[in-house]
Amino acid sequence: MNAQAEEFKKYLETNGIKPKQFHKKELIFNQWDPQEYCIFLYDGITKLTSISENGTIMNLQYYKGAFVIMSGFIDTETSVGYYNLEVISEQATAYVIKINELKELLSKNLTHFFYVFQTLQKQVSYSLAKFNDFSINGKLGSICGQLLILTYVYGKETPDGIKITLDNLTMQELGYSSGIAHSSAVSRIISKLKQEKVIVYKNSCFYVQNLDYLKRYAPKLDEWFYLACPATWGKLN
């Protein structure tokens, strides 16, 4: 937790915005209801998903607190789209702020305005890096890119490799978050990565044993972590 996030939390509470507690599998917002909010995820882990008409689930992004998630446009105060934000950690603490309240709060304090602006700026550059790597290297690049993201954000070094400490990360979940809906395609790529000793899967967890391989197929994402999150990048490099 950085100092800016702590100060933003205090600023919200000083202005009457109280934290809400959520539990695993709860939805902070869902794609069937209006979503004109700013969510300040203080702690916990969530995932942003979209469910198609035929029931296909796509995991668009994982968020780890502290993080700012915008579900409404600041200028029009309308929804940016219809998605689900599901809690996947045991508990999560979030501040749910109406867009008109956010505008008023940020107009009074440039420090917090720039904190939110910087966070959203990072999200845009992250999305560009992800789109680049997922597009250029096909399905293998998508899986390697998503594994690299999860390794940097949730990785912990162990004797067996870098353990991705995200609960219940199955091959199906990995496929959904990589934009691959067919489990057979995910299975083939995972088998290839196992054979090449890039990863192992045991005790319901992925272990990365060749980080350089993932970086080779996701260079822009690796570059993004190096530039935007140097402390996170430096722990494993």
From Swiss-Prot:
Domain of life: Bacteria
Domain HTH crp-type positions: 137-212
Keywords: Activator, DNA-binding, Transcription, Transcription regulation, Virulence
GO cellular component: cytosol
SUPFAM superfamilies referenced in this protein's UniProt entry, alphabetically: cAMP-binding domain-like, Winged helix' DNA-binding domain
Residue pairs linked by disulfide bridges in the UniProt entry: none
Transmembrane parts of this sequence: none
GO molecular function: DNA binding; DNA-binding transcription factor activity
Function text: Positively regulates expression of listeriolysin, of 1-phosphadidylinositol phosphodiesterase (PI-PLC) and other virulence factors.
Protein name as it appears in the record: Listeriolysin regulatory protein
Organism: Listeria monocytogenes serovar 1/2a (strain ATCC BAA-679 / EGD-e)
